[in-house]
Design a protein with these regions (language model features):
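Short coil/turn linking the two alpha-helices of tandem helical-hairpin repeats
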Residues: 75-83, 106-120, 151-158, 190-197, ...
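C-terminal motif of bacterial Sec signal peptides marking the signal peptidase cleavage site
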Residues: 16-18
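N-terminal alpha-helical interaction modules that lie
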Residues: 25-83, 89, 147-190
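Sec-dependent N-terminal signal peptides
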Residues: 5-13
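Bacterial signal peptide processing site
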Residues: 20-22
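Terminal, low-structured helical/coil segments at or just beyond the last alpha-helical repeat
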Residues: 141-163, 237-250
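Alpha-helical repeat scaffolds
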Residues: 85-90, 119-134, 167-173, 202-206, ...
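Short helix-capping/linker turns of helical repeat alpha-solenoids
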Residues: 60-69, 94-104, 112, 135-144, ...
Length: 250
């Protein structure tokens, strides 16, 4: 009798455990679907990130030193985000006089110009731009970048496109397409990022489209983005070195 009761309790326990596991598994799946839905649908995921970068930059303007510059650069942690700091770095080095930012500019340009299909003219102009800075020509990292540029081979069949890791799948697709030279994706990305401070990060993609793919409208975008940034942040006249960068695309 006791044996039968124990067997019955054991079977009941196993059934309940199985049901519980199924419920938990189903609930977990629902949670995952909910999370995936939020990541795909929430429109301000990217803009909140950009807004944070903008706040860091405002702090840098008030306190133009290495500490606040590095705090801003820490927001550009991932490799695909690295070169998007290009405009911030141009201003930090040229307008705010932060020397360490000059190497960062060189690194941003290095990420794009290391692609083997870059035009010879653009490569020469960029080398000339980098060599204006003693900190780039004397610094170990700067020397490595310049050597990379000078040894760059021209082979249009070996395009290297960085992996994009953005939270927004739509933004990810458009950025990847722009890096591959898709005019359609570039236009959509430009429209998507033109409303608020997100436009700052378009400079890298405008630069890629103008420099690597010789897309004429992107050349105008480079100049427009820089002018808008200086105007909206009350930075005054564009400095000589940043103007030299813009002159590459006139």
């Amino acid at each position: 009798m006791k044996r039968n009761i124990l067997i019955g309790l054991l079977l009941l326990s196993l059934q309940q455990t199985g049901c519980t596991n199924n419920v938990q598994q189903n609930k977990s799946n629902e949670d995952n679907r909910s999370t995936e839905f939020n990541i795909d649908k929430v429109a301000n995921i990217d803009s909140s990130y950009y807004h944070l970068c903008s706040e860091k930059f405002e702090s840098l303007i008030k306190h133009p030193d290495d500490k606040h510059f590095h705090e801003l650069m820490n927001e550009f942690y991932y490799a695909d985000e690295y070169s998007e700091s290009l405009l911030y770095c141009l201003v930090a080095s040229n307008k705010l006089g932060i020397d360490v930012a000059k190497i960062r500019v060189a690194s941003c340009l290095s990420e794009s110009l290391s692609n083997p299909n870059v035009g010879q003219n653009s490569k020469d102009l960029s080398l000339s731009y980098l060599k204006k800075w003693a900190s780039c020509t004397k610094h170990k990292r700067g020397k490595q970048i310049i050597e990379r540029f000078e040894s760059l081979t021209m082979n249009e069949n070996q395009i290297r496109v960085p992996t994009i890791t953005y939270k927004s799948s739509e933004t990810q697709r458009l950025k990847a397409g722009s890096l591959k030279g898709s005019v359609e994706d570039y236009k959509k990305l430009k429209e998507k990022m033109s409303n608020d401070e997100m436009y700052v990060f378009m400079l890298y993609y405008a630069y890629i489209m103008a420099d690597r793919y010789a897309y004429s409208p992107a050349k105008k975008d480079v100049i427009t983005i820089v002018n808008r940034f200086y105007r909206e942040h009350n930075l005054g006249p564009i400095d000589k070195d940043t103007q030299s960068f813009c002159n590459l695309f006139e």
